[in-house]
């Protein structure tokens, strides 16, 4: 399963271990460098999460082309910047419809990973309350292709403001 911290995808703990073993820092200071390096490798890096969400959305788009899912999803096509968190929560809820409609394991894995990444990035925004925003059920129902395009657009809004 591909669900993992996106920050650990490119971080290699072996580099820290090699540095420690091949250097003359086999002292208390060297051990501190190694321990702090390992700790920093495991810290969440939310600035990369939205890029990973877009990657997963593109992957879902490609996977859905190979199967037929005839569903319409509540889609926010014109997101007001003051309602982007509310809209994102609606998009994440609607992704579960695709999970329910699809029996494809790759789609299930990718959507589950995307939901985890997006929720962890949303949690970094704190408990922001938005008022005057549409409820999910008030949104227009659109095809999966249009839904995914709108989803990418709102994720880009999060990237541009971070």
Swiss-Prot record:
It comes from the Eukaryota. Coiled coil: none annotated. Glycans are attached at residues 119, 127. Residues 30-48 form a propeptide. SUPFAM superfamilies: 4-helical cytokines (SSF47266). Residues 1-29 form the signal peptide. GO terms for molecular function: cytokine activity; cytokine receptor binding. GO terms for biological process: cell maturation; extrathymic T cell selection; immune response; interleukin-15-mediated signaling pathway; lymph node development; macrophage differentiation; natural killer cell differentiation; natural killer cell proliferation. It is found in: Secreted. Disulfide bonds join 83-133, 90-136. Keywords: Cytokine, Disulfide bond, Glycoprotein, Secreted, Signal. GO terms for cellular component: cytosol; extracellular space; nuclear speck. InterPro entries: 4_helix_cytokine-like_core (IPR009079), IL-15 (IPR020439), IL-15/IL-21_fam (IPR003443), IL-15_mml (IPR020466). Cytokine that plays a major role in the development of inflammatory and protective immune responses to microbial invaders and parasites by modulating immune cells of both the innate and adaptive immune systems. Stimulates the proliferation of natural killer cells, T-cells and B-cells and promotes the secretion of several cytokines. In monocytes, induces the production of IL8 and monocyte chemotactic protein 1/CCL2, two chemokines that attract neutrophils and monocytes respectively to sites of infection. Belongs to the IL-15/IL-21 family. This is Interleukin-15. It comes from Cavia porcellus (Guinea pig). The lineage of its organism: Eukaryota, Metazoa, Chordata, Craniata, Vertebrata.
């Amino acid at each position: 399963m591909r669900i993992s911290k996106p920050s650990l995808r490119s971080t290699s703990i072996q580099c820290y271990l090699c540095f420690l073993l091949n250097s003359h820092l086999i002292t208390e200071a060297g051990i501190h460098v190694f321990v702090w390096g390992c700790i920093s490798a495991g810290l969440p890096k939310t600035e990369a999460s939205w890029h990973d969400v877009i990657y997963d959305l593109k992957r879902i788009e490609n996977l859905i082309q190979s199967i037929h899912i005839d569903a319409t999803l509540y889609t926010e096509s014109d997101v007001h910047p003051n309602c982007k968190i509310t809209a994102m929560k609606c998009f994440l809820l609607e992704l579960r419809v695709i999970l329910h409609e699809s029996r494809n394991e790759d789609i299930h894995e990718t959507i589950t990973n995307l939901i985890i990444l997006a929720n962890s990035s949303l949690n970094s925004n704190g408990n922001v309350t938005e008022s005057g925003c549409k409820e999910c059920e008030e949104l227009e129902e659109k095809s999966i292709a249009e839904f995914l395009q709108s989803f990418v657009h709102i994720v880009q809004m999060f990237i541009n403001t971070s």
